[in-house]
Amino acid sequence: MHEQLSPRDQALEARLVELETRLSFQEQALNELSEALADARLTGARNAELIRHLLDDLGKVRSTLFADAADEPPPPHY
C-alpha cells in the first residue's frame, strides 16, 4: 500500500507543486506577452507604412502647390 511520506518529503512535494504552479503561470504570462509583442510589431509596421504613404502624398501636394523649390516660402526661423 501507500507509504506515509515523511515531513521532509511532504515539504519537498509541497515545494515542487508550488514551483510547478508558478512555472505554469509564468508560461501563460510569457505566451500572452509574446502575443502582445507580435500585435504591437504588426501595428508598428502598419503605422510605418501609413506614414510612408502620407509623406508621399504630402510630397505630391507640396510639389503641386510649389512647382519650383524657390517659390516655397522660407522656413519660419528666417
Curated annotation (Swiss-Prot):
InterPro entries xrefs: SlyX
Family: Belongs to the SlyX family.
Protein name: Protein SlyX homolog
Name of encoding gene: slyX
